[in-house]
């Protein structure tokens, strides 16, 4: 048996032992939960002046109490190709309309919005059915660290004006604190691995510009005012609830 097969078999056994255990849904249970999710978000506030729609991939890890309160950590990585900033590299364009590399040849310069946040959350589950009191309407509040910037790529080209630390003069790095609210539905399967959550979220980023100069606007002071970066979007995720296995009964003659 090759190494991959052994790892797959071990993971399958681990998953089956914990998440396939049959648990009655008539009563809430306490259990750890790990999940992965995808989401999309529309930018608002100051963020909308720089970027448009974001895709988001994330992880969550937490603990659900018998009271149906929950707490934990969640993190999202943001990625997009929707840039609303214009003219960033206009001063590097030659008379032929090209940005040239170190060999004097036309170069391709690409920019991509990127971001990340890491939050601590607290949530409350409001059950809708007596048959499964571990599923229902989920409300979460969270807060933590947020960062967003422009990723600048020149691929196989070397463009001296935007290499290494010079990129910092164009990347619009902003960091700060964020708050987030989530409203959706959470389904914990009592008898299997098909457990999911889905809903809407609203995020407010209270960030600051972290660069002291923008090379494309050297005569314009970088604002030191607090930014309000807003996002409104959806999230769909799958998670593994780590139910404890039911004790087995043994009979002896």
Where do the PLM segments sit?
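Residues that define the transmembrane beta-barrel architecture of outer-membrane proteins
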Residues: 30, 53-57, 114-118, 135, ...
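Structural signature of outer-membrane beta-barrel domains
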Residues: 41-43, 78-82, 125-127, 144-150, ...
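Sec-dependent signal peptide recognition
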Residues: 2-10
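Short glycine/proline- and aromatic-enriched beta-strand/turn motifs that initiate or cap beta-hairpins
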Residues: 21-72, 78, 237, 241, ...
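Predominantly the C-terminal beta-signal and adjacent terminal strand-loop region
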Residues: 181, 187-253
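Short loop/turn motifs that connect adjacent beta-strands in outer-membrane beta-barrel proteins
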Residues: 22-31, 68, 128-136, 188-196, ...
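Residues on the lipid-exposed face of transmembrane beta-strands in outer-membrane beta-barrel proteins
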Residues: 36-40, 59-63, 75, 118-124, ...
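Extracellular/periplasm-exposed beta-strand and loop segments of Gram-negative cell-envelope proteins
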Residues: 45-50, 83-115, 148-176, 207-216, ...
